[in-house]
Regions:
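Short loop/turn segments immediately following beta-strands, especially the blade-tip
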Residues: 13-16, 58-62
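Glycine-rich His-Gly loop
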Residues: 46, 138, 208-214, 290
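Alpha/beta-hydrolase fold active-site loops
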Residues: 187, 204, 283
Length: 342
């Protein structure tokens, strides 16, 4: 139960039994990933910025207080790092789309790895003694494939995960839009449907959201959605506040006292789908699982007129009593406790 990405990597010398472990960082340093190259360790942290930065410090004498900033925060959210012989590979989020970049050792700026489609590019493996990296690439309309990136930054499909007969339907399209919420925040909304779907308000539509723990809903192909899409259904995914699509700031804007933003964002996305004639309130359903039950449950009680169906899949609907359940205590950091007023 519970969720959190912060880590505390320790250090000890290989081949010297009894060597004391050295703590490189604490959870307060907000480090979520790290990579090692030579005598240096690179730390991905959201301490300097809610959109993350990469710091470098010495393995011999780690000191985050004097660590050098190798990659500064930008509009994109850094999500993962990996060290290879030719450079430091960076996984970053540009809205719902994930990209991979390479910062050659000694260079100031990272170059984007060119991939055949936009979707979710994720680092899988890299080694400081081998050039290049292995990554996966998936999209809303295409299943995951494995690519090898060479030291020159060229990506080649390894064919290690070949597409099946139904893994890349040519009749599906995905559109990325941003929807204005109740307070002006722009919420990323991904809309997937058949290319011949008519925008006449008649399409059955399922709107999915989660909005907790800073978890982002990124592009991914779901074969179980094919029957829905083939029958002219529309599937939409909203990265409401509480997700990590724009980093820690976006996450904290849908957290505890700001939690109402999550369902108000979902309501705004539902209204957008209706206004743009994808569907109507008589044919619109919303789906949220686990913590997403709070999202869809409160959207339902606030705007019952807007939805024809609500699916809380193993959904949390009673946040007040949730901490008394077997899995309740680990989730107190996310939702708070009835024993303490905040």
């Amino acid at each position: 139960g519970g969720d959190g990405r912060e880590t505390e990597p320790p250090l000890a010398t290989v081949g010297k039994p009894g060597t004391p472990w050295v703590k490189i960082c604490d959870r307060a340093d907000k480090v979520t990933d790290f990579a090692v190259k030579g005598d240096d360790i690179y730390l991905l942290t959201h301490a300097p910025s809610p959109r993350y930065a990469v710091l470098r410090t010495s393995l011999a004498k780690p000191d985050l207080g004097s660590a050098a900033a190798v990659v500064a925060a930008s509009d994109q959210v850094l999500f993962a790092i990996a060290a290879a012989r030719d450079g430091l590979y960076l996984e970053s989020r540009d809205g719902a789309v994930k990209r991979v970049k390479r910062l050659a050792w000694g260079a100031k700026d990272a170059a984007e790895v060119k991939l055949p489609i936009e979707g979710a590019a994720s680092l899988m493996s890299a080694s400081p003694v081998i050039g290049g990296a292995i990554l996966s690439l998936a999209a809303w309309t295409r299943a995951r494939e494995i690519f090898a990136v060479d030291a020159a930054g060229e990506a080649v499909n390894t064919k290690l995960q070949p597409l099946g007969a139904f893994d890349a339907p040519d009749r599906l399209v995905a559109t990325e839009v941003k929807v204005k919420s109740h307070d002006g925040a722009m919420v990323p909304l991904s809309i997937i449907h058949r290319s011949d779907v008519k925008l006449d308000g008649s399409n059955p539509t399922l709107l999915y959201g989660y909005g907790a723990y800073g978890i982002t809903e990124e592009p991914g192909f779901g074969p179980t959605r094919l029957a829905w899409l083939e029958k002219s259904g529309v599937y939409a995914v909203a990265n409401v506040r509480g997700s990590g699509v724009y980093g820690q700031e976006w996450y904290k804007a849908g957290y505890k006292a700001t939690k109402p933003n999550t369902w108000k964002d979902l309501i705004a996305c539902a209204e957008y789908l209706i206004a743009q004639k994808y569907t109507s309130n008589a044919k619109l359903g919303i789906l949220g699982g686990s913590a997403g039950g709070i999202l869809v449950g409160r959207a339902m009680t606030e705007r019952p007129d807007l939805f024809a169906a609500v699916i809380p899949a193993v959904g949390v609907l009673d946040a007040i009593r949730a901490e008394t359940t077997a899995n309740g205590v680990p989730n107190i950091p996310e939702f708070g406790t009835v024993k303490k007023e905040e």
